Amino acid sequence: MLDILTIHWNVDPVLLHLGPISLRWYSLLFVSGFIFGWYMVRSFYRREGVDERLLDPLLYAMLISVIVGARLGHCIFYDPQYYFGSWQGFLEVFQPWKGGLASHGGAIGIIIGLLWYTNKYGKKEGFDFFWLADRIVLVVCFAGACIRLGNFFNSEIIGYNTTLPWGIVFDRTGDPNPKHPTMLYEALTYLTMGVVMIWLYRKKLDKLYRGELFGIFLTFCFGMRGLLEFTKAPSVTVFTIGDVVINMGHLLSFPFAIAGIAFWIWSVKRGVPATIQRQPYRTPKKA
């Protein structure tokens, strides 16, 4: 009877085979996050009078920053001995399809990419790093949810054994025990945060300070990420406190959350309005 009630997950991670090319669910959801994000940022730019011609450079900067940052993050944080211990491993650093990506590295990459972009384009348009970061984190919430759904299709980022009714048997792993679907917990967290932060942006932006949404995002996103790590089977254990395992995810998440609290407080004390005070930008008419 219990086996009948157990949720099994055995979906092929490959959505479509096109000759030698395979389209994976993860890739589709990853790209969908960027496409959806582009349209979100376009709506922000239109609403606040920023030149839409700056959207494409932002897209390229984010694509490069996320992929490079996430790949280096995986190699440095999770398996440096392999990737930097031999030439074979080092060459695989440049082959992200062999190994993985790390979200904390992707976050660092996004920050670096935004610093470059705002330094190059922001002064002319009247915005700075924190103005743009306040809006990009809204995109990151929904893109992060898409990526975690991609992890679900890949049967990865799986938690410990559980007897809870929503525990899932991931048949493709070969383990018959129900597990915490940690990737779905994270997807739901990011989606909920995205809805709340869109509401703050749409309804309360005139009452917020520049950098405040960025601080709120770091605080709650990585705070929750750190807590959810306690349900996840660790890939790299850093140390233990009694029966409690502290893994690399904890070690990377909580500093981000603490930084978020600091940015949140600093933005309120600084008191710079979150908006750009000017007329909305009008897209040039075609001749």
Task: List where the protein language model places each region.
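A feature for loop-to-transmembrane-helix boundaries and adjacent hydrophobic helices
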Residues: 1-287
